From Swiss-Prot:
It comes from the Bacteria. Keywords: Ribonucleoprotein, Ribosomal protein. HAMAP family: Ribosomal_bL35. It comes from Gluconobacter oxydans (strain 621H) (Gluconobacter suboxydans). One of its GO terms (molecular function) is structural constituent of ribosome. InterPro entries: Ribosomal_bL35, Ribosomal_bL35-like, Ribosomal_bL35_CS, Ribosomal_bL35_sf. The keyword Protein biosynthesis does not apply. This is Large ribosomal subunit protein bL35. GO terms for cellular component: ribonucleoprotein complex; ribosome. Pfam families: Ribosomal_L35p. Belongs to the bacterial ribosomal protein bL35 family. One of its GO terms (biological process) is translation.
Length: 67
């Protein structure tokens, strides 16, 4: 049986921690920031943890994990 391939978009956008959580960068940071509240801009700075259902899908698309 051939090897399964990891989706290229998943490699670029997500990281899997040692405990198995999936981390992603938040959206809504490209333009229109002058209209957004300061709290939203502040919380969008760092990486965020994905929900369990979304993380399950991402892990299926990355069968060998992400380094």
């Amino acid at each position: 049986m051939p090897k399964m391939k990891t989706k290229s978009s998943v490699k670029k956008r997500f990281k899997i921690t040692a405990t198995g959580k999936v981390m992603c960068g938040p959206g809504n940071k490209r333009h229109g920031l002058i209209n957004r509240p300061q709290k939203m801009k502040r919380t969008n700075r760092g990486p965020q943890t994905m929900t369990d259902m979304d993380a399950k899908t991402i892990k299926q698309w990355a069968p060998y994990g992400l380094s």
